[in-house]
Curated annotation (Swiss-Prot):
It is found in: Membrane. GO terms for cellular component: cytoplasm; membrane. Pfam families: MARVEL (PF01284). This is Myeloid-associated differentiation marker-like protein 2. The keyword Transmembrane helix applies. The gene is MYADML2. Its main location: membrane. Belongs to the MAL family. It is a multi-pass membrane protein.
Amino acid sequence: MGSTMEPPGGAYLHLGAVTSPVGTARVLQLAFGCTTFSLVAHRGGFAGVQGTFCMAAWGFCFAVSALVVACEFTRLHGCLRLSWGNFTAAFAMLATLLCATAAVLYPLYFARRECSPEPAGCAARDFRLAASVFAGLLFLAYAVEVALTRARPGQVSSYMATVSGLLKIVQAFVACIIFGALVHDSRYGRYVATQWCVAVYSLCFLATVAVVALSVMGHTGGLGCPFDRLVVVYTFLAVLLYLSAAVIWPVFCFDPKYGEPKRPPNCARGSCPWDSQLVVAIFTYVNLLLYVVDLAYSQRIRFVPSL
């Protein structure tokens, strides 16, 4: 998983890219991803935002996985101006989260045990159930790669392969869920305090993405300050910022003085501001916990930026 080319005279093709445990997991990702996408596109069907997200997630993961396997097999990854170990570790974690979400959403919104009344309804049901099974297998294939490539205690590795690096991807993913709930009629603009919370989410998200981007591009060595120290300082600040949001957001959304402590009975399903506010509150605490765990692990990581 290094970023250097083989010495002259070596084999041009790297068979270990498809025969090693990690390579086998990637081949299975391609097989399961293509099967899932094809089943849904051919007869299973999809609709709405949820279906579009699932298809986009599967298509994106398949395309990048194919690129990774091709570059590993032909040893062309050494020609790319990025840290290959950081890139593959970050993508595997992101793909795991995307495929996990799709593996939950597609069966929840589209899979049914009963046949639909339209012609060939039972065939569509069978295709959707099969797609749901392969979507779950696809998630497991990416999760296996994350488990195989994760840095072990005492092992020197690329930053994104450490627990702290993997948590950065999860933090950014959770922040995207928060943003999705915020734009879905959460009424965050009513108070300056809730606007502060949005600023916290945005600032921490941008900083996390910057850390991931610098690691993947291999530019962590030219910052004028040790990268691991910067990561620890930023993570500590993120914990403080999220702690403030974890206190402020519930008060200004669910306290009787400012908001609704209970879900309004006349609130329509799918378009209720209270639901969006609850989602934001829950995932604020999730991200706070992730940053606390990240801070604990950041104290003892050892990594090589160029891997």
